[in-house]
Amino acid sequence: MSWLTKLLPPKIKREQGPQRRGNLPEGLWSKCPSCEAVLYATDLENNLQVCPKCGHHNRLNSRQRLDLLLDSEGRFEIGAEVLPVDSLKFKDSKKYPDRLMEANESTGESDSLVVLQGAIKTMPVVAAAFEFDFMGGSMGSVLGERFVRGVQAAVEQKMPFICITASGGARMQEGLFSLMQMAKTTAALTKLSAAGLPFISILTDPTMGGVSASFAFVGDVVIAEPKALIGFAGPRVIEQTVRETLPEGFQRSEFLLEKGAIDMIVDRRELRDQVARVLALLQKLPAAA
Protein backbone atom coordinates (compact mmCIF):
# COMPACT_ATOMS: atom_id res chain seq x y z
CA MET A 1 0.00 0.00 0.00
CA SER A 2 1.45 3.40 -1.03
CA TRP A 3 1.71 6.45 1.23
CA LEU A 4 -1.02 8.15 -0.87
CA THR A 5 -3.41 5.27 -0.27
CA LYS A 6 -2.80 5.57 3.45
CA LEU A 7 -3.58 9.31 3.38
CA LEU A 8 -6.80 8.86 1.38
CA PRO A 9 -9.02 6.23 3.00
CA PRO A 10 -10.95 3.95 0.60
CA LYS A 11 -14.30 5.39 1.71
CA ILE A 12 -13.32 8.89 0.67
CA LYS A 13 -12.02 7.70 -2.70
CA ARG A 14 -15.21 5.77 -3.41
CA GLU A 15 -17.60 8.55 -2.45
CA GLN A 16 -15.82 11.66 -3.70
CA GLY A 17 -13.95 10.43 -6.80
CA PRO A 18 -16.93 9.28 -8.88
CA GLN A 19 -18.98 12.23 -7.63
CA ARG A 20 -16.46 14.74 -8.95
CA ARG A 21 -16.44 13.04 -12.35
CA GLY A 22 -20.23 12.97 -12.38
CA ASN A 23 -20.41 16.77 -12.03
CA LEU A 24 -18.76 17.21 -15.47
CA PRO A 25 -21.26 16.55 -18.29
CA GLU A 26 -20.05 14.83 -21.43
CA GLY A 27 -19.45 17.00 -24.47
CA LEU A 28 -18.50 20.04 -22.41
CA TRP A 29 -15.22 20.50 -24.29
CA SER A 30 -14.23 19.99 -27.91
CA LYS A 31 -10.81 19.69 -29.54
CA CYS A 32 -10.22 21.49 -32.83
CA PRO A 33 -9.06 18.94 -35.45
CA SER A 34 -6.91 21.61 -37.11
CA CYS A 35 -5.04 23.52 -34.38
CA GLU A 36 -5.87 21.07 -31.55
CA ALA A 37 -7.07 23.90 -29.30
CA VAL A 38 -9.41 22.76 -26.52
CA LEU A 39 -12.63 24.74 -26.89
CA TYR A 40 -15.71 25.17 -24.73
CA ALA A 41 -18.52 23.48 -26.67
CA THR A 42 -21.00 26.31 -26.06
CA ASP A 43 -18.54 28.90 -27.40
CA LEU A 44 -17.97 26.75 -30.49
CA GLU A 45 -21.71 26.42 -31.05
CA ASN A 46 -22.24 30.16 -30.67
CA ASN A 47 -19.49 30.68 -33.26
CA LEU A 48 -21.36 28.46 -35.78
CA GLN A 49 -18.88 25.59 -35.26
CA VAL A 50 -15.97 27.73 -36.46
CA CYS A 51 -12.82 27.48 -34.32
CA PRO A 52 -12.16 30.93 -32.80
CA LYS A 53 -8.43 30.16 -32.65
CA CYS A 54 -7.64 29.10 -36.23
CA GLY A 55 -10.90 29.58 -38.17
CA HIS A 56 -11.35 25.87 -38.95
CA HIS A 57 -14.90 25.18 -40.18
CA ASN A 58 -16.34 22.07 -38.54
CA ARG A 59 -19.08 20.26 -40.40
CA LEU A 60 -22.76 21.09 -39.88
CA ASN A 61 -25.79 18.96 -40.60
CA SER A 62 -28.35 19.91 -43.23
CA ARG A 63 -30.86 21.52 -40.86
CA GLN A 64 -28.16 23.61 -39.20
CA ARG A 65 -27.01 24.92 -42.57
CA LEU A 66 -30.54 25.83 -43.62
CA ASP A 67 -31.22 27.50 -40.25
CA LEU A 68 -28.04 29.52 -40.74
CA LEU A 69 -29.09 30.70 -44.19
CA LEU A 70 -32.88 31.12 -44.15
CA ASP A 71 -35.25 33.41 -42.27
CA SER A 72 -36.89 31.59 -39.38
CA GLU A 73 -40.48 32.17 -40.52
CA GLY A 74 -42.47 31.05 -43.56
CA ARG A 75 -40.52 27.88 -44.37
CA PHE A 76 -41.86 24.57 -45.59
CA GLU A 77 -40.22 21.38 -46.80
CA ILE A 78 -40.33 20.09 -50.37
CA GLY A 79 -40.12 16.41 -51.33
CA ALA A 80 -40.09 14.94 -47.81
CA GLU A 81 -42.62 12.33 -48.96
CA VAL A 82 -40.10 10.87 -51.45
CA LEU A 83 -38.42 7.92 -49.72
CA PRO A 84 -35.67 5.46 -50.80
CA VAL A 85 -36.41 1.92 -52.00
CA ASP A 86 -34.11 -1.04 -52.55
CA SER A 87 -34.83 -1.57 -56.26
CA LEU A 88 -31.66 -3.60 -56.87
CA LYS A 89 -31.86 -5.69 -53.66
CA PHE A 90 -28.27 -4.58 -53.12
CA LYS A 91 -26.13 -6.16 -50.44
CA ASP A 92 -22.48 -5.59 -49.57
CA SER A 93 -21.36 -6.17 -45.99
CA LYS A 94 -24.89 -5.06 -45.02
CA LYS A 95 -28.22 -4.95 -46.79
CA TYR A 96 -29.15 -1.57 -48.25
CA PRO A 97 -32.37 -1.25 -46.16
CA ASP A 98 -30.31 -1.87 -43.03
CA ARG A 99 -27.91 0.93 -43.97
CA LEU A 100 -30.85 3.25 -44.62
CA MET A 101 -32.35 2.41 -41.24
CA GLU A 102 -29.07 3.04 -39.44
CA ALA A 103 -28.59 6.35 -41.24
CA ASN A 104 -32.14 7.40 -40.37
CA GLU A 105 -31.66 6.52 -36.70
CA SER A 106 -28.37 8.43 -36.45
CA THR A 107 -29.46 11.58 -38.33
CA GLY A 108 -33.24 11.74 -38.06
CA GLU A 109 -33.38 12.25 -41.84
CA SER A 110 -34.96 9.93 -44.42
CA ASP A 111 -32.29 10.64 -47.06
CA SER A 112 -29.26 12.81 -47.78
CA LEU A 113 -30.95 15.99 -49.06
CA VAL A 114 -33.32 18.43 -47.34
CA VAL A 115 -35.12 21.03 -49.48
CA LEU A 116 -36.93 24.03 -48.00
CA GLN A 117 -38.82 26.93 -49.52
CA GLY A 118 -38.28 30.07 -47.51
CA ALA A 119 -36.58 33.46 -47.66
CA ILE A 120 -33.22 35.12 -47.05
CA LYS A 121 -33.75 38.60 -45.59
CA THR A 122 -37.30 38.53 -47.01
CA MET A 123 -36.09 37.53 -50.51
CA PRO A 124 -37.96 34.31 -51.46
CA VAL A 125 -35.75 31.31 -52.32
CA VAL A 126 -35.73 27.54 -52.51
CA ALA A 127 -32.72 26.10 -50.68
CA ALA A 128 -31.38 22.54 -50.54
CA ALA A 129 -28.73 21.18 -48.16
CA PHE A 130 -26.91 17.86 -48.12
CA GLU A 131 -26.86 15.69 -45.00
CA PHE A 132 -23.34 14.26 -45.04
CA ASP A 133 -23.95 12.02 -42.03
CA PHE A 134 -26.60 10.15 -44.03
CA MET A 135 -24.45 7.63 -45.94
CA GLY A 136 -21.79 10.23 -46.69
CA GLY A 137 -24.26 12.58 -48.39
CA SER A 138 -24.32 10.14 -51.29
CA MET A 139 -26.44 10.97 -54.33
CA GLY A 140 -29.22 8.48 -54.99
CA SER A 141 -32.67 8.49 -56.57
CA VAL A 142 -34.36 10.27 -53.67
CA LEU A 143 -31.78 13.04 -53.62
CA GLY A 144 -32.17 13.55 -57.36
CA GLU A 145 -35.97 13.66 -57.16
CA ARG A 146 -36.00 16.07 -54.22
CA PHE A 147 -33.46 18.28 -55.99
CA VAL A 148 -35.58 18.37 -59.16
CA ARG A 149 -38.76 19.12 -57.21
CA GLY A 150 -36.96 21.97 -55.49
CA VAL A 151 -35.85 23.40 -58.83
CA GLN A 152 -39.38 22.98 -60.25
CA ALA A 153 -40.83 24.85 -57.27
CA ALA A 154 -38.30 27.64 -57.81
CA VAL A 155 -39.27 27.91 -61.49
CA GLU A 156 -43.01 27.88 -60.75
CA GLN A 157 -42.69 30.46 -57.97
CA LYS A 158 -40.04 32.48 -59.86
CA MET A 159 -37.47 32.16 -57.08
CA PRO A 160 -33.70 31.63 -57.01
CA PHE A 161 -32.42 28.16 -56.14
CA ILE A 162 -29.56 27.56 -53.70
CA CYS A 163 -27.80 24.27 -52.98
CA ILE A 164 -25.32 23.59 -50.18
CA THR A 165 -23.28 20.50 -51.02
CA ALA A 166 -21.48 18.03 -48.74
CA SER A 167 -21.12 14.66 -50.42
CA GLY A 168 -18.79 11.77 -51.10
CA GLY A 169 -20.40 11.19 -54.51
CA ALA A 170 -22.80 8.68 -56.05
CA ARG A 171 -24.52 6.04 -53.90
CA MET A 172 -23.09 2.70 -54.96
CA GLN A 173 -26.04 0.76 -53.51
CA GLU A 174 -28.25 2.20 -56.29
CA GLY A 175 -25.90 1.51 -59.20
CA LEU A 176 -26.91 3.18 -62.47
CA PHE A 177 -29.96 4.75 -60.82
CA SER A 178 -27.51 6.82 -58.81
CA LEU A 179 -25.42 7.81 -61.83
CA MET A 180 -28.59 8.91 -63.63
CA GLN A 181 -29.06 11.64 -61.03
CA MET A 182 -26.01 13.49 -62.36
CA ALA A 183 -27.81 14.13 -65.64
CA LYS A 184 -31.23 14.54 -64.03
CA THR A 185 -30.17 17.29 -61.64
CA THR A 186 -28.13 19.17 -64.23
CA ALA A 187 -30.97 19.00 -66.77
CA ALA A 188 -33.38 20.47 -64.22
CA LEU A 189 -31.08 23.45 -63.77
CA THR A 190 -31.29 24.26 -67.49
CA LYS A 191 -34.98 25.04 -66.94
CA LEU A 192 -34.05 27.35 -64.08
CA SER A 193 -31.55 29.12 -66.33
CA ALA A 194 -34.07 29.35 -69.18
CA ALA A 195 -36.46 31.09 -66.80
CA GLY A 196 -33.77 33.65 -65.98
CA LEU A 197 -33.55 32.60 -62.33
CA PRO A 198 -30.26 32.45 -60.38
CA PHE A 199 -28.63 29.29 -59.09
CA ILE A 200 -26.14 29.74 -56.26
CA SER A 201 -23.96 26.74 -55.43
CA ILE A 202 -22.32 26.65 -51.99
CA LEU A 203 -19.57 24.03 -51.68
CA THR A 204 -18.63 22.75 -48.23
CA ASP A 205 -16.27 20.09 -46.93
CA PRO A 206 -16.33 17.62 -48.61
CA THR A 207 -17.81 17.99 -52.10
CA MET A 208 -16.56 15.06 -54.14
CA GLY A 209 -17.39 12.50 -56.84
CA GLY A 210 -20.55 12.67 -58.90
CA VAL A 211 -21.84 15.78 -57.14
CA SER A 212 -18.76 17.82 -58.07
CA ALA A 213 -18.88 16.34 -61.58
CA SER A 214 -22.50 17.35 -62.20
CA PHE A 215 -24.34 20.37 -60.81
CA ALA A 216 -21.96 21.68 -58.12
CA PHE A 217 -19.95 23.90 -60.48
CA VAL A 218 -22.72 25.08 -62.81
CA GLY A 219 -24.02 27.79 -60.48
CA ASP A 220 -24.27 31.38 -61.65
CA VAL A 221 -22.19 32.05 -58.55
CA VAL A 222 -20.11 29.30 -56.90
CA ILE A 223 -19.19 29.92 -53.27
CA ALA A 224 -17.01 27.72 -51.05
CA GLU A 225 -16.25 27.58 -47.35
CA PRO A 226 -12.59 28.02 -46.34
CA LYS A 227 -10.30 24.99 -46.77
CA ALA A 228 -13.14 22.76 -48.01
CA LEU A 229 -12.07 19.58 -49.84
CA ILE A 230 -13.57 19.81 -53.33
CA GLY A 231 -12.87 17.54 -56.29
CA PHE A 232 -13.70 14.29 -58.06
CA ALA A 233 -11.30 11.61 -56.81
CA GLY A 234 -9.54 12.01 -53.47
CA PRO A 235 -5.94 13.27 -53.28
CA ARG A 236 -4.54 9.87 -52.24
CA VAL A 237 -6.23 8.14 -55.18
CA ILE A 238 -4.79 10.72 -57.58
CA GLU A 239 -1.29 10.41 -56.12
CA GLN A 240 -1.39 6.62 -56.45
CA THR A 241 -2.57 6.95 -60.06
CA VAL A 242 -0.15 9.60 -61.36
CA ARG A 243 2.66 8.55 -58.99
CA GLU A 244 3.45 12.15 -58.14
CA THR A 245 3.19 14.23 -55.00
CA LEU A 246 0.37 16.76 -55.30
CA PRO A 247 0.87 20.45 -54.45
CA GLU A 248 0.11 21.52 -50.90
CA GLY A 249 -3.54 22.48 -50.54
CA PHE A 250 -4.51 20.65 -53.74
CA GLN A 251 -8.32 20.34 -54.07
CA ARG A 252 -8.90 22.81 -51.28
CA SER A 253 -11.15 25.80 -51.90
CA GLU A 254 -8.22 28.26 -51.85
CA PHE A 255 -6.48 26.30 -54.62
CA LEU A 256 -9.68 26.25 -56.70
CA LEU A 257 -10.18 29.98 -56.24
CA GLU A 258 -6.63 30.63 -57.43
CA LYS A 259 -7.30 28.51 -60.55
CA GLY A 260 -10.63 30.21 -61.26
CA ALA A 261 -12.85 27.18 -60.57
CA ILE A 262 -14.95 29.00 -57.96
CA ASP A 263 -16.00 32.62 -57.56
CA MET A 264 -15.41 33.32 -53.88
CA ILE A 265 -14.58 31.88 -50.48
CA VAL A 266 -16.88 33.04 -47.70
CA ASP A 267 -16.52 32.51 -43.97
CA ARG A 268 -19.59 30.74 -42.60
CA ARG A 269 -20.25 33.58 -40.17
CA GLU A 270 -20.62 35.96 -43.12
CA LEU A 271 -22.41 33.57 -45.49
CA ARG A 272 -25.99 34.73 -44.99
CA ASP A 273 -25.10 38.40 -45.54
CA GLN A 274 -22.97 37.59 -48.59
CA VAL A 275 -25.62 35.37 -50.20
CA ALA A 276 -28.22 38.09 -49.61
CA ARG A 277 -25.99 40.63 -51.39
CA VAL A 278 -25.44 38.25 -54.32
CA LEU A 279 -29.17 37.54 -54.61
CA ALA A 280 -29.99 41.24 -54.62
CA LEU A 281 -27.36 41.85 -57.31
CA LEU A 282 -28.49 38.99 -59.55
CA GLN A 283 -32.15 39.99 -59.28
CA LYS A 284 -31.45 43.72 -59.58
CA LEU A 285 -33.01 44.40 -56.19
CA PRO A 286 -32.02 46.98 -53.55
CA ALA A 287 -29.19 45.71 -51.36
CA ALA A 288 -30.45 43.66 -48.42
CA ALA A 289 -30.08 45.25 -45.01
Curated annotation (Swiss-Prot):
Keywords assigned by UniProt, alphabetized: ATP-binding, Cytoplasm, Fatty acid biosynthesis, Fatty acid metabolism, Lipid biosynthesis, Lipid metabolism, Metal-binding, Nucleotide-binding, Transferase, Zinc, Zinc-finger
Function field: Component of the acetyl coenzyme A carboxylase (ACC) complex. Biotin carboxylase (BC) catalyzes the carboxylation of biotin on its carrier protein (BCCP) and then the CO(2) group is transferred by the transcarboxylase to acetyl-CoA to form malonyl-CoA.
GO biological process: fatty acid biosynthetic process; malonyl-CoA biosynthetic process
CoA carboxyltransferase N-terminal domain mapped to chain residues: 28-289
Enzyme category, top tier: transferase
One cellular-component annotation, GO: acetate CoA-transferase complex
Full protein name: Acetyl-coenzyme A carboxylase carboxyl transferase subunit beta
Compartments (UniProt record): Cytoplasm
Reactions the enzyme catalyzes: N(6)-carboxybiotinyl-L-lysyl-[protein] + acetyl-CoA = N(6)-biotinyl-L-lysyl-[protein] + malonyl-CoA
